[in-house]
């Protein structure tokens, strides 16, 4: 009985607070109307995002954001774009490795040096 009352009070409380579940959708339609087959060097990229097909858009979309802020839709079937995606993924994985390496170096600096067992033991003087 107590658990049912507490459950109902919890539901009423959440309702009063305005907690609602909402569906988050990227867009109600495809973001890319047309695509570019032109070549973009991966060093000029700021970001590269790939969106899988969804109920609202039945095609794979790749959106490149350049360092100057321009956004371009790329053709996912193009050989140049596939190569660009591989280079971008390689660049991102290298950045993650560097970040992990810096974190490891920082942890190593914060550690106290270990002393040998012989130094820890108290020596008897005779």
From Swiss-Prot:
List of glycosylated residues: 58
A Gene Ontology term for the protein's cellular component: extracellular space
Residues in the signal sequence: 1-21
Span list, region Disordered: 91-126
Biased composition (Basic residues): 93-126
Domain of life: Eukaryota
Disulfide links within the chain: 30-57, 32-73
Keywords assigned: Cytokine, Disulfide bond, Glycoprotein, Inflammatory response, Secreted, Signal
GO molecular function, one term: CXCR3 chemokine receptor binding
Keyword check for Lipid metabolism: no
Induction comment: By interferon gamma.
BP terms from Gene Ontology: adenylate cyclase-activating G protein-coupled receptor signaling pathway; chemotaxis; defense response to virus; immune response; inflammatory response; positive regulation of myoblast differentiation; positive regulation of myoblast fusion; positive regulation of release of sequestered calcium ion into cytosol
Compartments, as annotated in UniProt: Secreted
Pfam families the record matches: IL8
InterPro entries hit by this protein: Chemokine_b/g/d, Chemokine_CXC, Chemokine_CXC_CS, Chemokine_IL8-like_dom, CXC_Chemokine_domain, Interleukin_8-like_sf
Similarity annotation: Belongs to the intercrine alpha (chemokine CxC) family.
Biological role stated in the UniProt entry: May be a cytokine that affects the growth, movement, or activation state of cells that participate in immune and inflammatory response.
Protein name listed in UniProt: C-X-C motif chemokine 9
Organism: Mus musculus (Mouse)
């Amino acid at each position: 009985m107590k658990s049912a009352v507490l459950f109902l009070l919890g539901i009423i409380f959440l309702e009063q607070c305005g907690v609602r579940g909402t569906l988050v959708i990227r867009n109600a339609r495809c973001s890319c109307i047309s695509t570019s087959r032109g070549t973009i060097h991966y060093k000029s990229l700021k970001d590269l995002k790939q969106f899988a097909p969804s109920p609202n858009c039945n095609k794979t979309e790749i959106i490149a954001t350049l360092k100057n802020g321009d956004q371009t839709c790329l053709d996912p079937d193009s050989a140049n774009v596939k190569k660009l995606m591989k280079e971008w993924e390689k660049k991102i994985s290298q950045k993650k490795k560097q970040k992990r390496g810096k974190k490891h170096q920082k942890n190593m600096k914060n550690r106290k040096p270990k002393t040998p067992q012989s130094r820890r033991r108290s020596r008897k003087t005779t």
